[in-house]
Amino acid sequence: MKFFGWMQNKLHGKQEITHRPSISSASSHHPREEFNDWPHGLLAIGTFGNKKQTPQTLDQEVIQEETVSNLHVEGRQAQDTDQELSSSDDLEEDFTPEEVGKLQKELTKLLTRRSKKRKSDVNRELANLPLDRFLNCPSSLEVDRRISNALCDEKEEDIERTISVILGRCKAISTESKNKTKKNKRDLSKTSVSHLLKKMFVCTEGFSPVPRPILRDTFQETRMEKLLRMMLHKKVNTQASSKQTSTKKYLQDKQQLSLKNEEEEGRSSNDGGKWVKTDSDFIVLEI
C-alpha cells in the first residue's frame, strides 16, 4: 500500500507529506479507488504510462491541498497569539499598575500643556518673527500661519463679544422703535377722533367742502417736460414759416418769368419793320 502510494505521488509530481495526519486519513478513506486507477496506468510491457487524471483523483488532490493550506494558516495564527500573550506578560512583569497610572497622568499633563500655550510663549514667538522672516524669506506663509495661530484665540473671543454686544443693541433698538410706533398710533387716533368731534359740534356749517384737485397741480411739470414742449413749439413754428417763405418765393419767380416773356415779345414786335441788308443781298444773288 505504501509503495503504491509513493509511486503515485512520484508520477503526478507530488511530494510526500508525512507529518500531516489529515492526508493519511484522506488517503485511507479511498484505498479501493486508488487500486482501481492503477491497472489503467500500466502498459503491456510492464512500464507505467502517463494517463490523464480522472475527476475523482482531481477532487482528492484539491481536498488535500485545502487541508494543508488550512493547517498552515492555523499554525501561523497560533504563533501570533502566543507572541502577543508573551509580550503582554513581559509588560505586566516590567510595570506595576501604580507605575502605569503615573505614566498615564504624565501623558495627560504633557498633552494639556501642549494644547494650552501661555501668553509669554506667544509674545516670544511674535518678538522673534521679524528675525525669522529675514532669515527665511521664502517661508513667509509659515510666518503668517504662526501669527494667525497665535492670535486666533484672542480674536475669536473679541469677535464673539462684539457680536453679542451688537445683537443686544439691535434688540434694544427694535423694541424701542416698536414701542414708539405704538405710542404714535395711539396719539394720532386720539387726536383725530377729538378733532372730528370738535368740528362736528362747534362748527354750525359742518364740514368744509373739500377743494377739487387740479390736474396741473397733481401732474407737476418737470424741467425736461418744459424743454420738450418748447422744442416742439419751435419746430412747429419753423415748419409754418418755411412753408410761407417757399410759397412767396414761388410766386415771385412766376411774376419775374411773366415779365421777362412780355419784354421779349415787345422787342420782337418792334424789330419786325426794320430792313436788313443781308436779306437784300441774298435776294440779288438769287436773281
Swiss-Prot record:
Q: Which family does it belong to?
A: Belongs to the LAZY family.
Please list where the region (Disordered) is annotated: 15-36, 71-99, 236-280
Q: Where are the compositionally biased (Polar residues) regions?
A: 237-259
Q: What is the lineage of its organism?
A: Eukaryota, Viridiplantae, Streptophyta, Embryophyta, Tracheophyta
Give Gene Ontology CC terms. Answer: nucleus
Motif location (IGT motif)?
41-47
InterPro entries from the entry?
LAZY
Q: Which UniProt keywords apply?
A: Growth regulation, Nucleus
Found, by tissue, as follows: Specifically expressed in roots. Expressed in root tips. Expressed in the endodermis of inflorescence stems and hypocotyls. Highly expressed in the lower hypocotyl and root stele of young seedlings.
> Gene encoding this polypeptide?
LAZY4
Instruction: Tell me the compartments it is located in.
Output: Nucleus
Q: What else is known?
A: Plants overexpressing LAZY4 exhibit steep lateral root angles, upward leaf curling, shortened siliques and narrow lateral branch angles.
Q: Where is the composition biased (Acidic residues)?
A: 81-97
This protein's source sits in the domain of life called Eukaryota
What GO biological process term is on the record, naming one?
Answer: regulation of growth
Q: Which organism is it from?
A: Arabidopsis thaliana (Mouse-ear cress)
Q: What happens when the gene is disrupted?
A: No visible phenotype under normal growth conditions. Roots of plants lacking LAZY2, LAZY3 and LAZY4 exhibit a negative gravitropic response, and grow upward in the opposite direrction of root gravitropism. Increased branch angles of lateral roots and reduced length of primary root.
What protein am I looking at?
Protein LAZY 4
According to its UniProt entry, what is the function of this protein? Involved in the regulation of root gravitropism. Functions redundantly with LAZY2 and LAZY3 in the control of root gravitropism. Involved in the development of the root system architecture by influencing lateral root angles and primary root length. Functions redundantly with LAZY1, LAZY2 and LAZY3 to control plant architecture by coupling gravity sensing to the formation of auxin gradients. Involved in the establishement of auxin gradient in primary and lateral roots upon gravitropic stimulation. Involved redundantly with LAZY1 and LAZY2 in the regulation of both shoot and root gravitropism.
Question: What's the main place this protein lives?
Answer: nucleus
